[in-house]
C-alpha cells in the first residue's frame, strides 16, 4: 500500500479526492462552526466507498466529479464572502443571470474568478488523465463484493423507511409518565412533601407523554409510491445521520442540491401554470409620450409605530420627514404576518381570506403594467427559492427583468438593501419610455443588526457585533429594540436615495412603499418577539406614497384624493388596485372603489389571521402583546 502511495500519480489523485471532500470544512478555517462535522465526514466516506465499489476504478467514476470541479470556484467564493455553500437559491440565480449581469456583479473580482476557473479546469483535466492512466487504485479483491453487499443492505433499509415511513420511538408507560408530568397535589406532612396524583391524571399524563416526544423521535411518514401497506421501518433501523449531512457533503452532495433545485423549479412551474394564460386586457387610460417611472417598494418586517414619520419619539426617519410630496398612510394593515402569504395579497387580486392557500389563478400587477406598455423590473434583496420564498417568485417571474441580488440569504453575510440602488439606476436609465420597478427589500428582517452598516448603529446597547443572538432570549430586549430602530433609520436612508434618483431627470415618477408585516418586540410585559403572531404590532404596517411635481401636474385629482384618504382604513388588498390607478391603468372588471387614489374609493371590511379570519375593525386589543380578538365569531379558515 505504501509503495502505491509513493507513486506521484496515485498520490496526486488521492489528494484531489481529499481536497474535494474538504470543501465543506472551509468555514472552519475562518473560525466558523460546521453543523455535525462527523456526520458529514462519515457520509463522505460512505459515498467514496460506494463510488469505488460500484465503478471499481477511478477512471470510471472520475467523470462524475465534473460538476464538482465546475462548481468549486463558486462554492469557495460563497463560503468566503457569504459564509455558506451553493443552495437552490444560488442555483436559481445562476440559471437566471445573463453573462453581462454576472460580469457587473463580480466587478473587479471577475479576473480573479476567471483565473480560479482556469486553474480548476486544468486541475480537472490533469486529474482525469491521471485516473485514466493508473491501474494501481483499482479495487480488485473480494472485499469489494463485501462492500457492495453492505451498501445494498443499507440502501434497502433506507428505501424501506423512505417508502413506508419510520416508526416513532416508543412512548414511556403512563404509570411512569404519571410520576413525572401528571397533575399533582403537594401535601405538607411532617416537614416533608409527598406527591398525590389527581383523579384525572392518567389521560392527561398520556397526552403529555405523547406531546413530550421530541421531533427527532416522532414517526416519519413514508412517500407511499408503491401503494403497498407494509409496516414502517422499526426505529432501530433508522440511519444514524440526517439526510442534510449528505446534502452538505462534497462532492457527491451536489446531487442532492441539484435535485432540490429541480424540485423547486418544478414546484414554481406548477404554481405558475395556474395563471399562465391569464390576461387583464389592461391599457393606460390617457397614454402620452412622456417618459414615466413607477416604483413599488415592498418593505420587510417593518413596524408602523417605529417610524418617526408616524409619531415615534426617536428620529428614525430624518430624511423622509423632509419630503414635501410624501403622503404617509396612517392605517394600513396586512392580513397575515408572513412574507410568503402577505406579499401575494399585496401584488395581486388574491383576497386576504385566501392568503393561506397556495397559488392563485391570476397574475400580478406586473402583467397588467406590461399589457399597458410598461417595461417591468423585479429587483430583489431576498431569496428566490424555498418554502418561504417560492410563492413570491412565481409572481416575480412575470417581470421582463428579474434580478435576485442577495447571495447571503438572511445571514450575517447578506447584502444591505443598498445593493438595489445600482440596478435601480440602470432601470431608470433604460431606453423604454414607461417603466415599473419593484424593489423587494430585506428591510428589518432578523437578525436586525445585520440589516445596516455600522454607521447606522445609532442606539446603544445594540446587537451589532454580537454573534448569533437568540431573539427568543428576552434578556436582550434593550439591544434587540435598539438594533431594530437602527434598521428603520437605514431604511429611511435607502428610501430617500430611491426618491432622490426619481427626482433626477425629466421623467414623470411616483413611488409606493408598503411593508409586508411588522414585528413584536417584547413590548412592555409581552413575552413575544419576531413575527408570525396575531398582534397589532405585526398587522399594522408603515406605508406611504411619494410623487414628483411632474406627476402631480399630470394627475392633480389623484394626488388630491391621496391626501384626502391618508387616514382611511386600508389594507394590503388595496395595494394592487391603487398601484394600477397610480399608473393610470384601466382594465375590464376593475374595482376603482378599492383604489384610495380614486374618487370612487370606499373602505372595505379588513380581515386578519387571528383565531380564524378576524374582522380587524370589530375587534378588541388584548394585553401588552396587543392580540387582535374578534368581538364576534371569526370566519373559518381554509388552507
Model-derived regions, located:
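Transmembrane and membrane-interface helices of multi-pass
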Residues: 1-241
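Membrane-interface soluble catalytic domains
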Residues: 2-15, 28-30, 34, 53-62, ...
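A long, amphipathic alpha-helix that forms part
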Residues: 44, 48, 280, 422-425, ...
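Active-site-proximal alpha/beta segments of enzymes that process anionic O-linked groups
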Residues: 160-468, 571-572, 577-598
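Metal-dependent active-site segment of extracytoplasmic phospho-/sulfohydrolases and closely related
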Residues: 295-296, 487-529, 576-580
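Histidine-centered active-site microenvironments of extracellular/periplasmic hydrolases
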Residues: 311-315, 507-508, 512-556, 592
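Short glycine/proline-rich turn/loop motifs
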Residues: 345, 469-480, 554-561
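Acidic helix/loop microenvironments that form the catalytic cleft of cell-wall polysaccharide enzymes
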Residues: 443-447, 515-523, 599-602
Amino acid at each position: 500500500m505504501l509503495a502505491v502511495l509513493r507513486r506521484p500519480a496515485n498520490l496526486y489523485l488521492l489528494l484531489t479526492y481529499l481536497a474535494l471532500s474538504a470543501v465543506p470544512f472551509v468555514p472552519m478555517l475562518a473560525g466558523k462552526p460546521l453543523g455535525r462535522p462527523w456526520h458529514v465526514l462519515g457520509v463522505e466516506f460512505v459515498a467514496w466507498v460506494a463510488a469505488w465499489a460500484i465503478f471499481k476504478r477511478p477512471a470510471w467514476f472520475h467523470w462524475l466529479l465534473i460538476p464538482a470541479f465546475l462548481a468549486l470556484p463558486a462554492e469557495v467564493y460563497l463560503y468566503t464572502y457569504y459564509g455558506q455553500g451553493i443552495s437552490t437559491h444560488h442555483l436559481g440565480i445562476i440559471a437566471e443571470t445573463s453573462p453581462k449581469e454576472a460580469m457587473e456583479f463580480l466587478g473587479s473580482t471577475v479576473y480573479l474568478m476567471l483565473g480560479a476557473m482556469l486553474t480548476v479546469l486544468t486541475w480537472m483535466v490533469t486529474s482525469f488523465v491521471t485516473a485514466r492512466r493508473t491501474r494501481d487504485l483499482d479495487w480488485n479483491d473480494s472485499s469489494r463484493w463485501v462492500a457492495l453487499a453492505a451498501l445494498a443492505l443499507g440502501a434497502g433499509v433506507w428505501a424501506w423507511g423512505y417508502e413506508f415511513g419510520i416508526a416513532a420511538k416508543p412512548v414511556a408507560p403512563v404509570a411512569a409518565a404519571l410520576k413525572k408530568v401528571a397533575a399533582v397535589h403537594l401535601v405538607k406532612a411532617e416537614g416533608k412533601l409527598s406527591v398525590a396524583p389527581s383523579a384525572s391524571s392518567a389521560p392527561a399524563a398520556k397526552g403529555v407523554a405523547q406531546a413530550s416526544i421530541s421531533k427527532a423521535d416522532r414517526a416519519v411518514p413514508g412517500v407511499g409510491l408503491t401503494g403497498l401497506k407494509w409496516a414502517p421501518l422499526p426505529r432501530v433501523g433508522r440511519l444514524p445521520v440526517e439526510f442534510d449531512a449528505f446534502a452538505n457533503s462534497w462532492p457527491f452532495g451536489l446531487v442532492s442540491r441539484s435535485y432540490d433545485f429541480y424540485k423547486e423549479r418544478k414546484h414554481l412551474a406548477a404554481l405558475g401554470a395556474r395563471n399562465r394564460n391569464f390576461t387583464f386586457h389592461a391599457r393606460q387610460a390617457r397614454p402620452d409620450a412622456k417618459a414615466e417611472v413607477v416604483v413599488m417598494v415592498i418593505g420587510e418586517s417593518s413596524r408602523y409605530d417605529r417610524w418617526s414619520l408616524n409619531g415615534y419619539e426617536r428620529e428614525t426617519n430624518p430624511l423622509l420627514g423632509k419630503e414635501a410630496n410624501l403622503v404617509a398612510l396612517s392605517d394600513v394593515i396586512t392580513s397575515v404576518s408572513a412574507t410568503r402569504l402577505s406579499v401575494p395579497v399585496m401584488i395581486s387580486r388574491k383576497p386576504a381570506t385566501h392568503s393561506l392557500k397556495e397559488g392563485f389563478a391570476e397574475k400580478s400587477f406586473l402583467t397588467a403594467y406590461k399589457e399597458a406598455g410598461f417595461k417591468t423590473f423585479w429587483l430583489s434583496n431576498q431569496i428566490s427559492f424555498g418554502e418561504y420564498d417560492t410563492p413570491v417568485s412565481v409572481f416575480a417571474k412575470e417581470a421582463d427583468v428579474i434580478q435576485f441580488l442577495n447571495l447571503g440569504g438572511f445571514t450575517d453575510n447578506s447584502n444591505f438593501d443598498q445593493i438595489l440602488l445600482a440596478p435601480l439606476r440602470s432601470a431608470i436609465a433604460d431606453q423604454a419610455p414607461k417603466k415599473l420597478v419593484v424593489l423587494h427589500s430585506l428591510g428589518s428582517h432578523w437578525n436586525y443588526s445585520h440589516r445596516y452598516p455600522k454607521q447606522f448603529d445609532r442606539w446603544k446597547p445594540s446587537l451589532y457585533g454580537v454573534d448569533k443572538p437568540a431573539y427568543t432570549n428576552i434578556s436582550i430586549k434593550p439591544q434587540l429594540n435598539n438594533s431594530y430602530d437602527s434598521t428603520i433609520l437605514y431604511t429611511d436612508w435607502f428610501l430617500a436615495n430611491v426618491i432622490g434618483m426619481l427626482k433626477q431627470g425629466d421623467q414623470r415618477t411616483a413611488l409606493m412603499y408598503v411593508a409586508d408585516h411588522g414585528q413584536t418586540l417584547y413590548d412592555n410585559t409581552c413575552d413575544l418577539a419576531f413575527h408570525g403572531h396575531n398582534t397589532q404590532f405585526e398587522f399594522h404596517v408603515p406605508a406611504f406614497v411619494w410623487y414628483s411635481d411632474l406627476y402631480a401636474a399630470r394627475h392633480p385629482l389623484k394626488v388630491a384624493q391621496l391626501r384626502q384618504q391618508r387616514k382611511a382604513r386600508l389594507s394590503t388588498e388595496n395595494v394592487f388596485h391603487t398601484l394600477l390607478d397610480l399608473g393610470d391603468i384601466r382594465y375590464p372588471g376593475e374595482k376603482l372603489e378599492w383604489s384610495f387614489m380614486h374618487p370612487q374609493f370606499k373602505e372595505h371590511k379588513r380581515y386578519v389571521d387571528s383565531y380564524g379570519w378576524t374582522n380587524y375593525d370589530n375587534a378588541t386589543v388584548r394585553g401588552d402583546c396587543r392580540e387582535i380578538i374578534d368581538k364576534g365569531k371569526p370566519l373559518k379558515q381554509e388552507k
